């Protein structure tokens, strides 16, 4: 019988070298993200968001990236959820993209800030009606007695707002402003390629690149 210790994959699809990447990590991220899209990976826009509470206990969950540019990586959520409360206490957070079919990871660390009200309004208005109603109906991370209560709340909100529910005041965007971005490419014998970008004011790109041991 196969045991967990016997499960392993030897990565061999590609390599990663500092001479071949863009000096700007946001441009390099865009290159890799487009390659994930071209490969038709399932939901390449998913990422793990890690936060910590006031006692230093970590928690992680999958969220969807909704924007990435020189300012940082954007996602939207309920500000009163567990992650929202933890980010209000400690804005340090980490993101992880894992594209297993390409044998790649991207690790991002930095500080969280809220997006502007205008950005949150604009994205909220673009969401499907059911998702906009759901943002009102769900008191995210709170204990509820049953799904029936959630569905009743959904109907109530739908009847109240009709086709145009406004953005709830407790719902909006966050932007992770990175201090470091690591690109990881799986290699044979676990000798993976890891390139770490960190901010460097003296560099023309504003970043420096270092190779890390696997």
Curated annotation (Swiss-Prot):
Binds 1 FMN per subunit. Substrate binds at residues 8-11, 66, 123, 127, 131, 190-192. It catalyses: pyridoxamine 5'-phosphate + O2 + H2O = pyridoxal 5'-phosphate + H2O2 + NH4(+); pyridoxine 5'-phosphate + O2 = pyridoxal 5'-phosphate + H2O2. One of its GO terms (biological process) is pyridoxine biosynthetic process. Pathway: Cofactor metabolism; pyridoxal 5'-phosphate salvage; pyridoxal 5'-phosphate from pyridoxamine 5'-phosphate: step 1/1; Cofactor metabolism; pyridoxal 5'-phosphate salvage; pyridoxal 5'-phosphate from pyridoxine 5'-phosphate: step 1/1. GO terms for molecular function: FMN binding; pyridoxamine phosphate oxidase activity. Its cofactor is FMN. InterPro entries: Pyridox_Oxase, Pyridox_Oxase_CS, Pyridox_Oxase_N, Pyridoxamine_oxidase_dimer_C, Split_barrel_FMN-bd. It is an enzyme of class 1 (oxidoreductase). It holds the Pfam family PNP_phzG_C. Its EC number is 1.4.3.5. FMN binds at residues 61-66, 76-77, 82-83, 105, 140-141, 184, 194. Keywords: Flavoprotein, FMN, Oxidoreductase, Pyridoxine biosynthesis. Catalyzes the oxidation of either pyridoxine 5'-phosphate (PNP) or pyridoxamine 5'-phosphate (PMP) into pyridoxal 5'-phosphate (PLP). Homodimer. Belongs to the pyridoxamine 5'-phosphate oxidase family. This is Pyridoxine/pyridoxamine 5'-phosphate oxidase. It comes from Burkholderia pseudomallei (strain K96243). The lineage of its organism: Bacteria, Pseudomonadati, Pseudomonadota, Betaproteobacteria, Burkholderiales. The gene is pdxH.
């Amino acid at each position: 019988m196969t045991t967990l210790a016997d499960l392993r994959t030897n990565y061999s699809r590609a390599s990663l070298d500092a001479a071949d990447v863009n000096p700007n990590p946001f441009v390099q991220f865009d290159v890799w993200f487009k390659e994930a899209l071209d490969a038709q990976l399932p939901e390449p826009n998913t990422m793990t968001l890690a936060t910590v509470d006031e006692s230093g206990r970590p928690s992680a969950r999958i969220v969807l990236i909704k924007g990435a540019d020189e300012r940082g990586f954007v996602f939207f959520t309920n500000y009163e959820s567990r992650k929202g409360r933890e980010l209000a206490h400690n804005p340090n957070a980490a993101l992880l993209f894992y594209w297993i079919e390409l044998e790649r990871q991207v690790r991002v660390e930095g500080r969280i800030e809220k997006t502007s009200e205008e950005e949150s309004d604009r994205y909220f208005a673009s969401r499907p009606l059911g998702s906009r109603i759901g943002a009102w109906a769900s008191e995210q991370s709170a204990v509820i007695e049953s799904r029936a209560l959630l569905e009743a709340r959904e109907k109530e909100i739908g009847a109240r707002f009709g086709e145009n529910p406004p953005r709830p005041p407790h719902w909006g965007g966050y932007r992770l402003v990175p201090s470091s971005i690591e690109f990881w490419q799986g290699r044979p014998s676990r000798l993976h390629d890891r390139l770490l970008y960190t901010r460097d004011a003296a560099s023309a790109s504003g970043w420096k690149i270092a190779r890390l041991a696997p």
